[in-house]
Amino acid sequence: MRQRRDVAALMAATLTDPTTTHAAATETTSKAPDYSRFDWMDHWYPVAWTRDLPVDAVTKVTLFDVDYCVVNRGEREPLALEDKCPHRLAALSEGRLTAQGYVQCAYHGWSFDASGACKSTIRSAASTALCATAVPCRVEQGLLWLFPGAAAGRDPESVAPPRVPEMDDPAFKCTTTVRDLPIDYALLVENILDPDHFLFAHQAAPMDIYSASKESPQTVTVEEPSPGCYAISSAVAAVPKLATNDQKTAMAVVTGMSRRFSTRPCCRRALDSLLDFHTGIADGDSLTAKSTFRPPCAIATGRRDAAGATKFQQTFWLCPTGVGRTRFMAAGVGRLPFSIPRWLQHVGLNNFLDQDTHLLATQQPYVLQAEYDAAKAGAPLVRRQLYKYSSPTERILVEVGKFMDAAVPKTPNRYAEPLKLLAPCPPRETTLDRYAQHTQVCPDSRGAVRNAKALRLVSWAAAATVAAGRVARLGSVARAAASPAALGLAALGYAAHAFVGEFAFKYGSAKRDRDLR
């Protein structure tokens, strides 16, 4: 608790009202950006990592509360259709891919090619009037992207998915993750672009280099390379702001708080090494901590030198699956000395996400209620009036809030079911259900869980067999139980059991309270 009070005191010393300094510290285009030009339907959206999709099998994905049936064709072009058969509106994602490469509905066998053309109706001749709705799709940097605006006359060739140059560099290693969060898209964007919350929600003090202070102000820039396409960026000197106020206390915070980044010692050491590599507190280089939001989906954060180069970048893709729901996809891209197994990264990241996901879920009903009330009154929600911004780090949130004020009310299907905006906060067992949100959609994690369950079964069975054999020989249960082999096998089984628990709900109130100490 002392460490948390120290952080609060140090932050209080650096807080300032961003509304009084925003103009001086913000650089924009020659005139204020017109966010009303943003068109949700004129962009590509990432819906899944291709490695998480089975090859030549149908899978359902969701975007703007609309379901799509997608097929990962491996080395061939993917295909995507709206997830309803024109015959009787059954879900195509419940069907299969035929040997001819057609999506076949499981209800009556109607089959469709990648263009949506009906190729077979089994009992009648195919007709252009019986087509399914095809959606342009493509694979870029391991992500499957959809372009939902083609049916509304938008041109998928006029815009391209945003790319991460480092992901194309063979010198960089990349580890990806996915989680379906019960958090609204706008809230998640604000959360990722808010470095201050790392000090409290995550106890990750090294991330303080992304925060701002009076001595190290945050610069916000807005670019519009083409009409309706924006890049909103923040930049600040990549130095520990706490250390500039009180070196001794700041270092105590760094060593005391950030080292509780994960609950498992082995994971904690690996993640601390990665976090230190990412933040580089000990580095003497003159670096800039930069975060860039490219609406609608991409956020990139990293330390960059004067030439714009980085050793590590964290990139996020947020797919707005629906009101109050977002598919969170991320990639750590860096010149790392080693590759981290994907399932191990997921253990650490799930622990990390659990620390603030329920906090966002408690915030969500109030924000969506305010949006609902504003929509009823025929006006957009004004976040600068709803929130009480006070930190110099929140200057980028002020700017992003302006974008959200203009863009969110135009989100497809946003108000189709108004009651979704009025949903209460679910219990933490729901908001932090790792199995439903992550394990079910990640084959690497499912494989790790399957292997751990097998190891648990074999270890405990072997431990029981060894103990039973010693009982038969020694005639003493107590002496048999003391067998080093039996104890070792039992411990191995327990470790496997604990590992399985990492992929289901585990962040209860008791664990939260331990993190807050």
Model-assigned labels for residue ranges:
Residues 1-23:
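N-terminal mitochondrial targeting presequence
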Residues 1-3, 14, 37, 55, ...:
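A generic helix-loop boundary/linker signal
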Residues 7-8, 12, 60, 178, ...:
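Generic N-terminal initiation segments characterized by hydrophobic and/or small/turn-forming residues
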Residues 15-23, 27, 32-38, 46-173, ...:
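Rieske [2Fe-2S] iron-sulfur-binding domain
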Residues 33, 77, 153-517:
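C-terminal catalytic domain of Rieske-type non-heme iron oxygenases
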Residues 41, 131, 138-140, 310-312, ...:
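A short, structural micro-pattern
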Residues 43-45, 66, 133, 218, ...:
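Short beta-strand or tight-loop elements
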